[in-house]
Amino acid sequence: MTVTFCGHGDFHGEKAVMDWLRETVGALILRGADEFLLGGYGGFDACAATVVWELKKKYPTIRSTLVLPYLDRTVDATKYAGTLYPPLEQVPMRYAISKRNDWMIREADVVVAYVTHDWGGAAKALAYAKRKKKEIINYEKF
């Protein structure tokens, strides 16, 4: 099972959300999740990567992949098993992150979300996941 994440960039690692994220990812692993696609941009992405990295110590067979929106940027991939660049060569740079997000959602079986308002990139990604009829686990419904 493949899992991806979407959430607000201004997330700062609030304890209640982090606890929920650990519990949610752990439960998904027990359900068979073994591949985690992560975006690497913003606060929620960083926290999701940290949680998956921590849980890899307990579940060594899980794999975390940093999905890159650009090829010309240097990134810190130390918390990931590897990186991947989806087929975005023809996408204008200003759309690369949203198109990368769409790609991750299409590839995933489950989307774990921290979306608390209905504007911005995280809200657009969540709306896309709903249109694609993905299983969505959202911290806070609005």
Question: Can you name each region flagged by the protein language model?
Answer:
Residues 1-142:
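Acidic/glycine-enriched connector segments
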